[in-house]
Amino acid sequence: VIGGGIIGVFAAYYLAKRGLSVTVVEKGRIGAEQSSRNWGWCRQQNRDARELPMATRSLELWEQFAADSGEDTGFRRCGLLYLSNDGDEIARWAKWRDFARTAGVTTHMLSGREASERGRDTGRAWKGGVFSPSDGTADPAKAAPSVAAALMKLGGIVQQNCAARGIELEGGRVSGVVTEAGTIKTRTVVFAGGAWASSFCRQLGIRFPQATVRQSIVRVSGVTEHLPDALHTARVSITRRSDGSYNLAISGRGRVDPTAQLLRFAPQFLPMFAKRWRNVFPGGLEGIRAGHETLARWRLDTPTPMERVRILDPKPDAAAVKQTYNRAVELVPALGKTGISNAWAGFVDNTPDGVPGIGELPEIPGFILAAGFSGHGFGIGPGAGHLIADLVTGDEPIFDPAPYNPVRFKQSAWGKVADF
């Protein structure tokens, strides 16, 4: 398994549970990129229809993992609260509620009175909202390392600070993984490399359309009031961390850095950017400096871009940090008592339709891709990992894998952009 984020470690864990010999190679540290830089939401609410089965099973698997492994990911079903004064937005939530009922998902539409009561910490009235009681959060700082620890209990191997440089083939099929520490012989590789997926696939002659969006999160500490565990509004969202601090973020807001890879795939991403133009802004040179979107090719016997940049750690967007904090304090004044503790950013790997690509690539038997989770992969990590293990072993899939098959990006230039 190449990549030690939440997708990679869960895939490795479920493979090890089936008795396979599993090694995870991670160029930096387990969970150090987007898997530890997200909100931590584990949700069914407002999921795109294609992802809902994965989201539903993932909630069950988060709980089952803790019971089976004894490891703590910080997962809890605290419920997610959405509030709005926009009639159109509330109508969209009601439409999603009607769809979700057909899938057996429970979600509660809130009247103005109910929304205002649940959102009383904001000190304002709301027209409506929605509460999803079975959804929850996990701790991004704990989750991937906890799963890696469980994997090692099962006999799996985790190699950190060990970059995978490429793949060896025999007769057109995977025969090994070349790492900076040597070659690992194997007939099956799972690539769960996040923002590095497209450039890695390019080395294999595979076109995987991917664009990264640089998003920022703000953290505040010392809040004595017990605010909602997870609250979303159109202007800002807040999430309570396991240590009592709060993460603040603006949903979908980010910067797109102009890179050669972005220009290469720009036509396929036009529908997505057109749908989200209000929150996506032109970026700068961060993407070029990071090197994960390079179009260059590299040799397997010399250091690669992954060894030069062990962990993608972009600077947070100063304007976004200021705007996020100001909006959060305006929404919940109690968040403004102590100021900003810290802020960080991450590169979110997106596909043109906002749905991940998971499946074996027909060009290279034995190579299974799992990437492009588009900023909402953390919560569905367990389900994705279980599905990957099913595909590797040939077991009956835990849910239909067809919507995630990466072959779709070759069959159609433009797919339906996901609803979030």
For each feature predicted by the language model, list its residue ranges.
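Glycine-rich Rossmann-fold phosphate-binding loop(s) that bind the pyrophosphate
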Residues: 3-5, 27, 193
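C-terminal lid/capping helical subdomain adjacent to the catalytic/cofactor pocket in oxidative enzymes
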Residues: 7-10, 18, 109, 114, ...
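Flavin-dependent oxidoreductases
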Residues: 10, 167-295, 307-318, 323-336, ...
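Glycine-rich FAD pyrophosphate-binding loop
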Residues: 16-36
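Helical element adjacent to the flavin cofactor pocket in flavoenzyme catalytic cores
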Residues: 130-188, 195-199
